Structure formats: structure tokens, C-alpha cells
């Protein structure tokens, strides 16, 4: 497999994402509470410490976090008198992203996988799920419980309504991703299917199922979604984005 470490997310192909998942070392991630004579057990000497797992604690109680393949060796030690294992992920291929690297507002409960790009001042609300290969533009809000599928491209200053589904494409590898251009508003519980392009400044009504491209500056609604009118002053006033919601300070 070709080296993709220096590639931007936008440059990753379906084939590369498939190989990334297939070839990744699957990990079972756990949180383990341990008690015992930890003073006699130098956990930092165990293989994988600092890279595969971490430890926080004192002389008689602590918490291990990381790859269970390495942590289970510690649990076999006689110095450990009791422990409790909490499973976070099982045979996981792609980890969650380190959200501290994003200059965005990310609320508790959002699930963001690695290999995702999030623009400055974007807002990711509670329960939103963003899959690998997705791109979220500057100032865009992903509302509560929205699903952004693999390789979806969402432009700048969009609002993706609560409960919406932006379809992802990894397989078949020939499938084209969803592209949502700048300044688009998508209503709650709308569904945008694979390969659809939603043109700039357009509006997708709540509950719509979009199966074909949406021209710029149009409003679509229904199942399947159809153009019902051009964006007008009334539409603009009803779908206006609030800049203050995107400020980080």
C-alpha cells in the first residue's frame, strides 16, 4: 500500500481508505480500574507503555487506558489484587480523532473518527457522527444526531440539520461522494444519497430525501426531493445563519 501519511483527507481515494481499514492493526481499547500493591509493580516498565496504553494512579489504586493486548499482561501480575475492565472498542480498525487539533466547537458526545478535516469555527453538536474521509468546511454547523458518512464533502458556512444523514461511500470504490457546496441549509432529518451534489446557497427542506443533484440557489422538498422554488428574500430570512454561534471566544 502506498504511503498516505502526508496526504490530505481530500486526496484519499476509496481504494486507499479501504486498504487503510483492511491493513490497520485491529485494537480492543479498554479502561481498567486496578487495585493492589502497585508500588511493587512498575507499570512503566511493561511493553507498550506510553504508546499502546497509559496509567494514572498511585501506590494502591489506578486506571489503565489503551490496548487490551498489552494491558492484559499487567493484569496477570500477582501485585494486582482486583480489577474491573470497561470495553470502549472491540477490534477497532480506525480510532477516534484527537479533537484537540481542531479549531472548532465540538460538544460532548460527538463521535469523530480519524482522517477527518474540520474547518475553523465549525460547530459539531451532541451526538453527531463524522466518519473517516469526511470534510467539514469553515463555519459549518453539524447539528445534533446528524450522520456524516465517509468521504462526504461539506462546504463553508452550511447548516446540516438535526438527525440528517449525509450518505457515505467507501464501497463500491467507484461510487462518488456527496458534495455539499458553500452556504447550504439542510433541514432536520433530511437524507442526501450517495453521489449527489447540492449547489451553493440552496435549501433542502426537513425530511426530504435527495436522490439527484440540487441546482444552486434552489429550494427542494419531498420524497424524492424536487425543486419547489428559487431561493428568495423570504427563504434567506428564514434560513439565516447566526455568526455568534460560531465564535470560539
UniProtKB/Swiss-Prot annotation:
Alphabetical keyword list: Acyltransferase, Amino-acid biosynthesis, Diaminopimelate biosynthesis, Lysine biosynthesis, Repeat, Transferase
Pathway it works in: Amino-acid biosynthesis; L-lysine biosynthesis via DAP pathway; LL-2,6-diaminopimelate from (S)-tetrahydrodipicolinate (acetylase route): step 1/3
A Gene Ontology biological process term: diaminopimelate biosynthetic process
EC class of the enzyme, as a word: transferase
Record PROSITE patterns: HEXAPEP_TRANSFERASES (PS00101)
InterPro entries, alphabetized: DapH, DapH_N, Hexapep, Hexapep_transf_CS, Trans_hexapeptide_repeat, Trimer_LpxA-like_sf
Catalysis: reaction(s): (S)-2,3,4,5-tetrahydrodipicolinate + acetyl-CoA + H2O = L-2-acetamido-6-oxoheptanedioate + CoA
Signal peptide (UniProt feature, chain positions): none
GO molecular function (one): tetrahydrodipicolinate N-acetyltransferase activity
SUPFAM superfamilies per UniProt: Trimeric LpxA-like enzymes
Protein EC: 2.3.1.89
Cited function: Catalyzes the transfer of an acetyl group from acetyl-CoA to tetrahydrodipicolinate.
Protein family per UniProt: Belongs to the transferase hexapeptide repeat family. DapH subfamily.
Listed name of the protein: 2,3,4,5-tetrahydropyridine-2,6-dicarboxylate N-acetyltransferase
Organism: Fervidobacterium nodosum (strain ATCC 35602 / DSM 5306 / Rt17-B1)
Gene coding for it: dapH
Amino acid at each position: 500500500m502506498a504511503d498516505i501519511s502526508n496526504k490530505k483527507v481530500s486526496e484519499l481515494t476509496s481504494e486507499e481508505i479501504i486498504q487503510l481499514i483492511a491493513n490497520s492493526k485491529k485494537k480492543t481499547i479498554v479502561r481498567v480500574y486496578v487495585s493492589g500493591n502497585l508500588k511493587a509493580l512498575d507499570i512503566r516498565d511493561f511493553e507498550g507503555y506510553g504508546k499502546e496504553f497509559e496509567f494514572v494512579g498511585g501506590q494502591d489504586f489506578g486506571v489503565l487506558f489503551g490496548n487490551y493486548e498489552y494491558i492484559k499482561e499487567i493484569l496477570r501480575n500477582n501485585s494486582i489484587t482486583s480489577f474491573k475492565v470497561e470495553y470502549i472498542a472491540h477490534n477497532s480498525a480506525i480510532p477516534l480523532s484527537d479533537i484537540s487539533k481542531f479549531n472548532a466547537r465540538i460538544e460532548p458526545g460527538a463521535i469523530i473518527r480519524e482522517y477527518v478535516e474540520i474547518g475553523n469555527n465549525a460547530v459539531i453538536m451532541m451526538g453527531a457522527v463524522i466518519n473517516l474521509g469526511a470534510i467539514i468546511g469553515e463555519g459549518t454547523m453539524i447539528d445534533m444526531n446528524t450522520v456524516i458518512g465517509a468521504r462526504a464533502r461539506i462546504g463553508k458556512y452550511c447548516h446540516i440539520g438535526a438527525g440528517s444523514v449525509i450518505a457515505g461511500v467507501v464501497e463500491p470504490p467507484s461510487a462518488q461522494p456527496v458534495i455539499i457546496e458553500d452556504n447550504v441549509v439542510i433541514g432536520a432529518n433530511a437524507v442526501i444519497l450517495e453521489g449527489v451534489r447540492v449547489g451553493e446557497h440552496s435549501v433542502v427542506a426537513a425530511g426530504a430525501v435527495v436522490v439527484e443533484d440540487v441546482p444552486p440557489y434552489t429550494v427542494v422538498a419531498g420524497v424524492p426531493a424536487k425543486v419547489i422554488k428559487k431561493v428568495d428574500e423570504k427563504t434567506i430570512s428564514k434560513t439565516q445563519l447566526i455568526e455568534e454561534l460560531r465564535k470560539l471566544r
